[in-house]
Amino acid sequence: SLVGSEMCIRDSESVGIAGLGFPSIQAFPKKYDPIFVALMHQKAVAEPVFQFTLKPGTGSTLHLGGVDYSKVKDKIDYVNVNPDDGFWITDGSVQGVKTKFVIDSGTTLIIGPMDQVLEVISKLPGVTPHYNLDSLQATFDCSRPPTVDFEINGKKYKLDKQQASYGTSFGRCVLSIMGQRGLPMHAWVLGDAFMQGVSVVFDMGRNRMGFALSA
């Protein structure tokens, strides 16, 4: 049985991935519920809600069974989602480029369709694209990080310097946004690089997703 509604996500060896999407995309036999759906059916959680608050280094949390309001700075802004999509998907835009977002804590970077990522990069002064077969990465002067705006339901979320950078290459910072061909639904995958600045609430009971700046 569940003995706590919150667990720390610490630096440790990865031993697998627990899918937290909707049952419509589960890869294993239908007689087995995805882990959070199983917790719901067993009434092991107070509410059909979980919340990710990711932080660089230590301090990340996964709150099960409700919302921990101490993790957010402002009002949580909710958007409706369609469980038939399987993934947690919402409409949005990046630097004014309209698209769809898949919110995925199992992805390290921010990955978007090649054409849209190139369009976004063209709007970021000092950012240089680098092609590699079916993927696209970019670099920038580490002392001049770009300002990248993600907009969801009319609210903007900016990447800070740490979120925008994913290591270095030849003395330049590597942008945490990567382009890739053939992405499903031509959607962006907003992974940890985005979620490190935003606390995200996943509400399976009301089929909605909430966003707020993390405290």
Role assignments for model-derived ranges:
Residues 5, 54-56, 145-215:
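Aspartic protease catalytic domain
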Residues 19-24, 53-56, 63-68, 80, ...:
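Short, structured patches in soluble enzyme cores that scaffold and shape functional sites
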Residues 24-25, 57-58, 69-71, 107-110, ...:
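Solvent-exposed loop/turn segments at secondary-structure junctions
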Residues 2-9:
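Short, small-residue-biased leader/transition segments that mark boundaries at the very start
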Residues 114-152:
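A compact, surface-exposed functional segment
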Residues 56-99, 166-171:
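Flexible, small-/acidic-enriched active-site or ligand-binding loops
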Residues 17-18, 100-105, 110-111, 189-190, ...:
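Short hydrophobic beta-strand that contains or immediately precedes a catalytic carboxylate
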Residues 86-116, 120-125:
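Flexible, glycine-rich surface segments
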